[in-house]
């Protein structure tokens, strides 16, 4: 599941948008406004509002498209729709995930004063524009930094990951560290590994999905005792060495993402659209990122918890 980026521009700035897509396309899943973004029988605004929620980042290219007179002075300005779309992505994704890259000399709205806006000099060919290539690289580094962080968004993946961590993962790990050993099937274990299985998608009831997965792996269900309550977990171990007890869990709380997406999309049909599936991918990715950050920052968890993908 690659990070998805929307790249917008005016028709006049499309060449630069295409160049940015070319540079970033090897690392991310990039879409131009010309890439079948707009659907038949939907208004431009409705499509934009919906599509903005499907992307992890937005990059808008502000080129010198129009000559505008402001208070008796003439300025080269970007096309109005580019600024509008930047504002839309800014509102949907937040200031750390929406970028506007400005051609030198293009006047931006005064509301953006005080914000550091990447600027570039347009050259022919574009590959010779040192400033453009430098700014693309800076944006790429910022994106790389942001995708390692879990952030609160319109849908609930971050909150669900936090709840799952503190209500299950950290409790189990603390119990593991406070016990001298755990007995399963007359075997005593002193080493442990907790595997969190992230489903490939949300196309089925997660509880049923987990049952099918654990059965396919011939895992044994046990009641894992902690200071607060007993948790049903699935385990396996090497029958010969009986060295490491491997525990498995699939977060059933992920079903809340599916319900939230249905409400957000105002679903009135059976089945899933491509847009619903893209939202699911984004939220699953953010759930995993948030959970991994919490694990890495917990002394009890970081050495025994692994996040794995459903096979």
From Swiss-Prot:
Q: Name one GO molecular function term.
A: NAD+ nucleosidase activity
Please name the source species. Answer: Flavobacterium daejeonense
- Tell me if Nucleotide-binding is a UniProt keyword of this record: yes
Function, as annotated = Effector protein of a CBASS antiviral system with NAD(+) hydrolase activity. CBASS (cyclic oligonucleotide-based antiphage signaling system) provides immunity against bacteriophage. The CD-NTase protein synthesizes cyclic nucleotides in response to infection; these serve as specific second messenger signals. The signals activate a diverse range of effectors, leading to bacterial cell death and thus abortive phage infection. A type I-D CBASS(GG) system.
Broad enzyme group: hydrolase
Where the record annotates domain TIR, the positions are 4-121
Positions of 3',3'-c-di-GMP binding: 168, 232, 249
Name of the molecule in the record: CD-NTase-associated protein 12
Q: Which family does it belong to?
A: In the C-terminal section; belongs to the bacterial STING family.
Q: Which Pfam families match?
A: CAP12-PCTIR_TIR, prok_STING
Q: Where is this region: STING domain?
A: 157-311
